[in-house]
């Protein structure tokens, strides 16, 4: 997780938790005038559009006061969904056996994108089975990771 994301998470998490939700993750995408702050929330009872709107209002108030992001940005609050992003080692461990897409911050063996079966977590590395090989990636080298839903015919 980037330093900016970690700082935003520390600011946002108490608000989300106080509202009865779990903060699944925070993703700040700096793209000039089109920057986005995406907050993923989860609940045992599920997440509705009204839940997202309520969290958005509360978090927006905190962000307006604390002002951790310079310039304009769009705030989005969402459930993680079926193709949920993975941010922490605990999240990776809980999706062991699932298919995942991983994008690295720097190339490994000439490429940055990998898709395969999540074999587990060892220390601070995730293990990925791909084309009969096992790859180990330190969590800090992962720029993005998502679960790839599998549908049976």
UniProtKB/Swiss-Prot annotation:
<dbReference type="Pfam" id="PF02576">
    <property type="entry name" value="RimP_N"/>
</dbReference>
<dbReference type="GO" id="GO:0005829">
    <property type="term" value="C:cytosol"/>
</dbReference>
<comment type="similarity">
    <text>Belongs to the RimP family.</text>
</comment>
<keyword id="KW-0690">Ribosome biogenesis</keyword>
<dbReference type="GO" id="GO:0006412">
    <property type="term" value="P:translation"/>
</dbReference>
<dbReference type="InterPro" id="IPR028998">
    <property type="entry name" value="RimP_C"/>
</dbReference>
<dbReference type="InterPro" id="IPR036847">
    <property type="entry name" value="RimP_C_sf"/>
</dbReference>
<dbReference type="InterPro" id="IPR028989">
    <property type="entry name" value="RimP_N"/>
</dbReference>
<keyword id="KW-0963">Cytoplasm</keyword>
<dbReference type="InterPro" id="IPR003728">
    <property type="entry name" value="Ribosome_maturation_RimP"/>
</dbReference>
<dbReference type="GO" id="GO:0000028">
    <property type="term" value="P:ribosomal small subunit assembly"/>
</dbReference>
<dbReference type="Pfam" id="PF17384">
    <property type="entry name" value="DUF150_C"/>
</dbReference>
<protein>
    <recommendedName>
        <fullName>Ribosome maturation factor RimP</fullName>
    </recommendedName>
</protein>
<dbReference type="InterPro" id="IPR035956">
    <property type="entry name" value="RimP_N_sf"/>
</dbReference>
<comment type="function">
    <text>Required for maturation of 30S ribosomal subunits.</text>
</comment>
């Amino acid at each position: 997780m980037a330093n900016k994301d970690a700082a935003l998470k520390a600011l946002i998490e108490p608000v989300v938790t106080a509202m009865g939700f779990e903060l699944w993750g925070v993703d700040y995408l700096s793209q000039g005038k089109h920057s986005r702050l995406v907050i993923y929330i989860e609940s045992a009872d599920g997440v509705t559009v009204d839940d997202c709107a309520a969290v958005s209002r509360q978090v927006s108030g905190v962000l307006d006061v604390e002002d951790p992001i310079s310039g304009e940005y769009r705030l989005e609050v969402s459930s993680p969904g079926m193709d949920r992003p993975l941010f922490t080692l605990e999240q990776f461990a809980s999706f062991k056996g699932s298919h995942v897409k991983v994008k690295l911050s720097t190339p490994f063996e000439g490429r940055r994108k990998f898709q395969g079966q999540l074999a587990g977590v060892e220390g601070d590395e995730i293990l990925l089975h791909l084309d009969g090989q096992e790859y180990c990636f330190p969590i800090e080298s992962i720029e993005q990771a998502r679960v790839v839903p599998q549908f049976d015919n």
